[in-house]
Structures are given as C-alpha cells and as structure tokens.
C-alpha cells in the first residue's frame, strides 16, 4: 500500500475547494476537501461526478469502490476505477462483452469515514514519512510476508467498522473494489457477517503486495506486473484469482498528447530537454528533503545549457514565490516555476524527464505519460520496492542527495540516449488502460455465479494460514 508518494501530482498541488478539479464526491463525508486530481479539464470526467449519489441510488444496482484517505494515491486509484465503471455503463462499445447494468450506480467511499473513531488519514500518513520511517519499513517488509500469512476475517469489521457492515447490508452491492488493505479487510468482514456473495476485487497501488491483504477471501487481485503475481502464488492465491492489469491511473493518462503543442501551451522551449520536478505537497513532511535537494541543485543549473527545468509547486504559493526569488537571485534563465496546473498529464507528456518521489501512483502516471524518471529521496516500505523495480528494469534513475541529483542530470546531459533507453524499458510496465481492465473484471465477476469455494466464504474472526516459500526476498 502506498502512503506517501502521491502528494505531488494529486492533492499535492490542488487548491482547497469543496469538490476539486475533477474529484469524486465521497458519500458520508461531504464536509471534507474532496479534490483528488490536478486534472482540471472537463473532458477528463463525466458531467456527473463518479460516486455522487441521488435519491434513486438505493434502488439501483451498485458497485462500491473503496479506499482509505492515507495520502492521496489510494483515493486517486479509486476515482480512476469509478470513472472507468461509469464509462463502461455509458458506452457499451467498451465493455468487451462484459455485462453491465444500464442503471449502474457507483459509490466511492473512504473506509475511514465508517470507523467507530474518527481517523485522520493525513496524520496516519505522517507515521510513514517522519522519524518512524525505518520502523515502518521493517513492518511493511516483514509483517506476514513469510510462511505465516493473513487470509482475512471479521475482526476489522466487528471492532472498528460495524457501520460499513450495515451499509453493505442495506446496499447489497454487486461488487466491492478496494484500493487499500483496510478497505479490503473491512469488505471481507462485511461479506462474512452479512452472508452476501458479492465479489471483492483487491487493487494494490504499488509494485509489490504487502502481507495484510485478505489473500484467501478475495475473489481477484488486480496487480501491476508479473513480479506481484509471483508474490501471490506462494501465498496460495489461485492463478484464476490473479489478473495483471496495471495500476489504475486517471482518464487523462489514457490520452495521447502532442509534445510540441503541450510545450507551447505551457510556454516551454521547443529546443530544450524539459525536466519536470513534481514538488507540490499536500502534506509537506514527505517533501521537506525533496525540496531541499531541489534548492541545492538550482545553482548548478547553469551547467546544463540544453536543459530547461520546470518545477511544479502546486497550491503552495509561498514555496513557488521562494523558488522564483532563488531563480532570480541566481540569474537562472532556464527554469520555470508553476503553481496549480490544469492538465498535468499533458505537462508530463510534454517533458523529457521527471524528477519525483517513488510513490506508486506517481510513477504509474509517469509511465503512462511516457516520461522517464529520476526518483529522488531515500525510499522506505513500498516506495523502496517501487525504486528497486523501476531501476532494475532500467526505467528510472534513483538518487538520494542533491549531489547525486546534479550528477544524474549531468550524466543525462552528456548521454541523451539514456532518456530514450529508459523510455523503452518503461514501456514494459506501461498499462494506461488499467482502470478499464479492472472495471471489466469487477463487472465480469459481479455477473458470474458466486464462488462455490467453501473456504473463501467461511466465517473467521482471525484467519491465518501457512504458505509456501516466498518468491522474493524482502
């Protein structure tokens, strides 16, 4: 699960508004800021926001897409799947033979809104980005990832989330799609308690599967790549319950953009290498060191005559003003500072290289936009796995300090072919239609006969089991 890397091109640079540019209205939490994307184009979302409810919803067949607001990546993935479900509902030509109710209702829910105690996902995310990061790294890598494994149970639902169980009892969903482990476990518990037979689809939003997913009580895992499937097989997840779909990105990242037109739109030079730094921060803590490294790199930008740096500061006007002062004082002509950007997918597609943190949704969007990456900062937990996966394939460079960042940019400046090589290697992971594929799988399962696997439907409070030797060393 990814808690930290998505605060740059999601809520990271979003202005505080009741709905956001193309966000999803979350039932049961109208008072919260709902902005989820920096993609402000009306073409990127249906006129009716996905998940928005109407008085008739109670009588319509419903698919629930559930996330946890710990960071913004899980929410962004949930929104992408919800938009894909609505697209399939409204355009039968995209269904590929999968049945879909014409009056399908899609609910996008934050599982934390159903807790006995009100939980602040942003504060929870800080545990994974502050001084406790090494502890989190150990727990993420080693908790129930060996031979002793977690299957699922009702504990989460009975102790913390009985309200969601009642919502499921009333709604009787066709299916539940979960982009966070808490959501998945609560969905499994609700199904056990209510005795319903709807399928549960798990969608990890990083490039490895952690140990707390309800492995034996989920109907399908939609994973990013074959390596994740290799992780699930020794955990006794049957092959027919694994689909390699990719990580769901927003609709804007399914589009193809003209690079020259994009540069003209954002006022960027056509004859330079555009390096885009995603430095916006909805939660500032994870980006303190990231921004410090960018600040220290600025004085060396004079060296790279063929490079034009674009820094996105998001909704942080104070940080944007600081960057502009620095560039002016240093006399840097080859830099542009942007605040809130409408059309982030187009901006990324207009760039040759992106400097970013290694969050699952961030790197997925870079892959979809065909933008090679320099991953900046020490990586822990799921971000460490993302770094290892991307660098091992040659799809990204990884640096941890400003000195290494300057060196990497110099290396790219002296060897431009590196960028093209990273782009080629990244194409093996690029799956811009992941959200559509996940939506099709969810609808296919919803239309099929319920599973007759007695073990998957059996009630447990806490269900642990023994697996085979893990496929990957953590």
Give a label for each model feature.
Residues 349-359:
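Acidic donor-binding loop of glycosyltransferase active sites
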């Amino acid at each position: 699960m990814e808690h930290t890397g998505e605060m740059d091109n999601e809520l990271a640079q979003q202005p505080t508004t009741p709905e956001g540019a193309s966000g999803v209205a979350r039932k049961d939490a109208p008072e919260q800021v709902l902005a989820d994307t920096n993609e402000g184009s009306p073409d990127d979302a249906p006129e009716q926001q996905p998940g928005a409810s109407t008085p008739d919803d109670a009588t319509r067949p419903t698919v629930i897409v559930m996330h946890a607001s710990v960071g913004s990546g899980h929410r962004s993935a949930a929104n992408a799947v919800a938009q894909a479900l609505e697209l399939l509902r409204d355009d039968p030509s995209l269904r590929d033979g999968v049945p879909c109710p014409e009056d399908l209702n899609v609910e996008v829910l934050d599982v934390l809104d159903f807790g006995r105690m009100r939980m602040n996902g942003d504060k929870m995310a800080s545990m994974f980005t502050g001084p406790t990061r090494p502890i989190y790294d150990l727990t993420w890598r080693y908790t129930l990832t060996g031979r002793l494994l977690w299957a699922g149970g009702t504990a989460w639902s009975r102790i913390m989330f009985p309200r969601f169980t009642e919502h499921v009892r009333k709604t009787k969903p066709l299916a539940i799609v979960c982009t966070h482990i808490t959501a998945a476990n609560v969905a499994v518990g609700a199904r056990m308690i209510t005795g319903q037979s709807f399928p549960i689809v798990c969608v990890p939003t990083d490039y490895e599967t952690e140990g707390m997913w309800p492995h034996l009580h989920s109907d399908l895992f939609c994973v990013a790549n074959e390596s994740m499937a290799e992780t699930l097989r020794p955990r006794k997840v049957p092959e027919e319950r694994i689909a390699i779909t990719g990580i769901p990105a927003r609709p804007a990242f399914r589009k193809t953009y003209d690079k020259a037109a994009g540069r003209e739109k954002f006022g960027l030079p056509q004859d330079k290498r555009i390096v885009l730094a995603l430095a916006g921060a909805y939660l500032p803590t994870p980006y303190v060191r990231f921004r410090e490294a960018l600040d220290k790199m600025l004085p060396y930008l004079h060296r790279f005559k063929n490079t034009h740096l674009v820094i996105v500061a998001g909704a942080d006007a104070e940080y944007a003003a600081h960057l502009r002062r620095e560039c002016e004082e240093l006399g840097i002509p080859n830099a542009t500072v942007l605040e809130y950007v409408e059309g982030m997918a187009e901006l990324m597609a207009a760039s040759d290289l992106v400097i970013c943190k290694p969050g699952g949704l961030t790197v997925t969007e870079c892959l979809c936009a065909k933008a090679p990456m320099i991953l900046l900062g020490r990586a822990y937990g799921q971000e460490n796995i993302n770094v290892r996966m991307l660098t091992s394939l040659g799809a990204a460079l990884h640096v941890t300090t400003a000195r290494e960042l300057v060196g990497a940019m110099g290396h790219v400046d002296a060897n431009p072919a590196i960028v093209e090589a990273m782009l080629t290697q990244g194409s093996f992971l690029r799956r811009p239609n992941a959200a559509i594929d996940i939506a099709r799988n969810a609808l296919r399962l919803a239309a099929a006969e319920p599973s007759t696997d007695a073990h998957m439907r059996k009630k447990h409070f806490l269900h642990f089991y023994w697996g085979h030797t893990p496929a990957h060393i953590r």
